[in-house]
Amino acid sequence: MKRILFFALLLGTLNVFAQSPAKFTETKFNFGKLKQNVPATHVFKFVNNGAKPLVIESAVAGCGCTTPEYPKQPITKGKEGTIKVTYNAAAMGAFTKDVTVKFAGQEEPVILNIVGEVIEAKPAPKKKQ
């Protein structure tokens, strides 16, 4: 009986530690088709479900064409935070870009992903005179 109780408590404890306190509404966003040289932005939202304030240590993009912005102040329990990701649509073609978000006190980062396709921007039609 003691062994069963011990293993039940152990499993419950492991489950609590495995969960991230940041609960994102989404971790992947599809921009669809974007016009070349027109930056595109998406805001990823999350809620702090943990017992302590949540601090973002870093949000790092995989390349220079993607820029993440994140709050520097702690997100208190139950409050919402956002990470704004801007993609500079300079190169034509399909793209997949990642932003790695590291929270203080968490070993595993959260990976945010944006995808889409950059198409040629059509020139404005000439006005008839």
Each language-model region and where it sits:
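Sec-dependent N-terminal signal peptides
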Residues: 4-16
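Long, low-complexity ectodomains and other extracytoplasmic segments of secretory-pathway proteins
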Residues: 18-39, 43-45, 106-129
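Surface-exposed loops/turns
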Residues: 36, 77, 91-92
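Asparagine-centered strand-capping/turn motif at beta-strand->loop junctions
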Residues: 46-50
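Surface-exposed binding patches on compact interaction domains or structured appendages
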Residues: 51-80
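Extracellular/luminal low-complexity segments enriched in Ser/Thr/Pro
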Residues: 82-91
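A short beta-strand micro-motif common to beta-rich folds, especially ectodomain repeats
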Residues: 95-105
